[in-house]
Each structure stands twice: as C-alpha cells, then as structure tokens.
C-alpha cells in the first residue's frame, strides 16, 4: 500500500499545473553524501545494493536531507546485465568493465533472459520497502537504454568515441538488431517488475546515444525505443527519457511515446521549445555551477525556472548527475530555492 503524501512531481510529469516546480537530482543518492561515504567504509557497493535495508536508506536520504520531491532507486544501470550472461565488473576509477564483450552474432545468441522475481529480488524488495513503509514521495525506477548498455558490452568498458559499437552497427546490422532485441526484452521485464513492486515513474537513461547522428538514430535506435516505451505504457506511469549531448535528437524523442524529455545543460528550455519540443521537460542546471558561488547558482537556477514557468510543463533537475564534490548543503539550499521561488510566481 502506497504511503505517498506529496505527488506533485507525478502531476507535473503528467503535464498538470502544480503549486510549485518540483525537483530532484540525478545521482542524488550516493557519492556526495557523508552518510553514504560512512556506509562505504563498512560495506561494498555490492553489499549495499543487495541488502534492501541499506539500499533503501541510501535511496531515501536525499528526500530527508534535501527535501526533493522524488527519490530515485539507488542502483547502477549495469545491475541487470549479469543475469543475461554479461560478465561485468565495476572498477573504481574506471567504471564498468565487460570481460566477455560482444563481437559477433554468436555472442549475442549466447545471452539469456532475465527473470526479475528470481534474479533481482533484492531490487524489488528495496522498492517495496520504500514505497510501502518509508517514502512519502514517489519513487522513480530506471534502466539503461539499449544503445548505452550495448556500448559498454561491445567496447568492453567506457569509451570516448564508441568506434567498436558503431562499426558493429554499420557492418553487421543483423547482429545489432539481435542485440537490441535481447536488451529490449531485458529492459521491459526489468522495468515491468519495478513498477509492479511500486515505482511510480520510470526514467530510461540513454546517456551516450548523443554520439549518433539523427539519421542513424532514426534507423538503428528509434524503432527500438518506440517498442520499449510503447510496451511500458500499459503501466500508466510517467515515462522519462534522458541522454547527454543529444540536442540534435530532441525532436526524435518528442515523437516517442514518453511523457518527459530530460535536457542536459547544453540546451535551454526556451531553445527546446523553439525547436518544437511539446513534452514535459526535465532539467537542466549544469552540475558544475553548484561548485560556484551562491549568487551564480541562484541566478542560473532562477533563469531555468523562469523559462520553465513561462513555457509550462517543467520539472527541475540537473543537466547531468550530482558529482561527488558537490556539497550536500548546496543541494538542500538549491531545493529550497526551487520550491520557494516557483511558489512566488
């Protein structure tokens, strides 16, 4: 049974008018919080994410400490991959490293199928614990998108130019679309289970898809994303898409069956609207600005809020994730600024 007392963000995601602009921050849970760093001295990342009590604690901390209007599940986008046969290791200072990278169709055909109930019960238990007992604001579930996940699986880890990924996509389209189908099946099952456990909105992170041009996106990715979001629509929860450096793809996203488009810091709300974006937009303060002086933070935040309130249909967020060097006190002050300033308008 849900114990939500503040559903402002859901109303905003649905395009309804709200009393103020709701706010949350990508990567709000975790590295920037002293409580989390203290926890990491006792437990590994694996232990935190696999113990519902610990994971729920980390997930809800930003709501308690900053006053955000939503929590986002504390997990990594790589979390479901081991259950379809991907040998992934999160290496400190590097990121995800794949020990069995995809090289051909045979590698794709070896991938299995995820069963969230038996494979990731700790994820679902965390969601239920939060939504039934602990959170009075909505919980956002999430998944990585096929292109972004595939880029790690093909490159073998993080990449600057995604040359191996693009080469396989161009050279072996049959292999590419077979991989897209496998990942789409996994994402749909994984997200289905999150919503059924209690998640009230879903964000799909397509972090690196901006490396594709618009034509390649239309051919190799858009049909895949259309299928995923179309199938997830049956849950009647808000669906959000987000990527970095993807200004040239905004109108492609506007065609997708999503409710919300996340903007990174490079494209203003006004620019997105001038391009023709009609969906609810989420964003988009540059995280680096939060390392500046308060006068600059306040000025830039109000500018974003003014544009959001002028055009309507806006949820405040950063243009990328919270970095470890951002002070928790700054995030609390920022949340208060967003709420108070937008209430006065």
Curated annotation (Swiss-Prot):
The main place the protein resides is: cytoplasm
Against Gene3D superfamilies, the record matches this protein to: 3.20.20.210
Q: Which cysteines are joined by disulfide bonds?
A: none
Provide the GO biological process annotations.
protoporphyrinogen IX biosynthetic process
Q: Does the keyword Cytoplasm feature in the UniProt annotation?
A: yes
Q: Name one GO cellular component term.
A: cytosol
Please state the span of the N-terminal signal peptide per the UniProt entry: none
Coiled-coil regions listed in the entry: none
Q: Which reaction is recorded as catalysed by this protein?
A: uroporphyrinogen III + 4 H(+) = coproporphyrinogen III + 4 CO2
Record-listed E.C. numbers: 4.1.1.37
Q: Which GO terms describe its molecular function?
A: uroporphyrinogen decarboxylase activity
Q: Which UniProt keywords apply?
A: Cytoplasm, Decarboxylase, Lyase, Porphyrin biosynthesis
Pathway linked to the protein: Porphyrin-containing compound metabolism; protoporphyrin-IX biosynthesis; coproporphyrinogen-III from 5-aminolevulinate: step 4/4
Binding positions for substrate?
27-31, 46, 76, 152, 207, 320
One Pfam family it belongs to = URO-D
| InterPro entries given in the database record | UROD/MetE-like_sf, Uroporphyrinogen_deCO2ase_HemE, Uroporphyrinogen_deCOase
Instruction: Indicate the annotated site residue(s) for Transition state stabilizer.
Output: 76
Q: What does this protein do?
A: Catalyzes the decarboxylation of four acetate groups of uroporphyrinogen-III to yield coproporphyrinogen-III.
Q: Of which family is this protein a member?
A: Belongs to the uroporphyrinogen decarboxylase family.
Name of this protein: Uroporphyrinogen decarboxylase
Q: Which organism does this sequence originate in? A: Oceanobacillus iheyensis (strain DSM 14371 / CIP 107618 / JCM 11309 / KCTC 3954 / HTE831)
Q: Which gene encodes it?
A: hemE
